[in-house]
């Protein structure tokens, strides 16, 4: 235990004395709402033009907004929503915005209850838990719908309902929620509802009834990925608020932007790279943030993302991954799908796991490749046909640590697996 008791700050003193890096790191976080959104004026103007009828108490068209992660969809919609509420206050009309995160609020009951309970203070508090007026469970859904309708009627005006990550709601609960919301205007006399759906997944509309899709997608807006120069502008804007003047080497922002541009133009990734670079420089008490800190940040973020990804895999996928780890421990840097299948079957037999077919194992290998956990390539073996080879791109100690957290794979019997017998099989 440390005996650093020389000041009230004790253990933390050395981490608080270096003020050469950050001025306000919070502006680099995803939940920060900038006053200016670079390179999104066309999309913001389009959303505003669609919602403008709300200011004259008319019903705006419903909007579906698409785009990859980190393309400014949510920030732009929130910005327009705030401006709409401000303009409505000046115009003497009533416009309310309610923003729901459908990754959290992913059932019809919770969506309807959240909207109804949030009408009085629709956008003043986070919308990640059901409010107090309607119980979290217990009412029939049609009663919740009726309560929402009554609340809307008594409130009057125009309500814009933003369903962020709408695809998560549809995939979990179907399209009943959207069916009810898109037809609610026909049940209202004194209020009007407009829906904005935000999605990273263009294909989620395949799950929708054609009538729902037709009502929901009256207007569609696509947010393209940012390119490297655009990401530079975004980072420069935030860096001026986040960092002490002169703390960043001139190569840092262009490098963060270039790396994030390779990741589908993701502004969140660019901001994470810049923030983590600064944090690493801060922790080592450096005088500034250099290119090496960006490289270190990239490696750290990729490792953290991989750990999270692997930890959520089903046991069968982890068993396939564990088979690859065993092959690597046997000295094989590159291994085939056939070899993975042999070792996987040994693992499945030992821990009483249902044995998958070779075809299904190949599918799981493709998924691991798509997630970036492994690399694969298909090679031709002439008259013997084609096979898939795979290998790990980085050190596997962290991967093994995460895989063996699964109780089924943290099995003493697996530690006694006869590796020599397996080696003999592959000679």
UniProtKB/Swiss-Prot annotation:
It comes from the Archaea. It holds the Pfam family Cdc6_C. The keyword Nucleotide-binding applies. Keywords: ATP-binding, DNA replication, Nucleotide-binding. Coiled coil: none annotated. InterPro entries: AAA+_ATPase, AAA_22, Cdc6_C, Cdc6_lid, ORC1/CDC6, Orc1/Cdc6_arc, P-loop_NTPase, WH-like_DNA-bd_sf. GO terms for biological process: DNA replication. One of its GO terms (molecular function) is ATP hydrolysis activity. The keyword ATP-binding applies. ATP binds at residues 71-75, 226, 238. NCBIfam families: orc1/cdc6 family replication initiation protein, PRK00411.1-3. Involved in regulation of DNA replication. Belongs to the CDC6/cdc18 family. This is ORC1-type DNA replication protein. It comes from Methanoculleus marisnigri (strain ATCC 35101 / DSM 1498 / JR1). The lineage of its organism: Archaea, Methanobacteriati, Methanobacteriota, Stenosarchaea group, Methanomicrobia. The gene is cdc6.
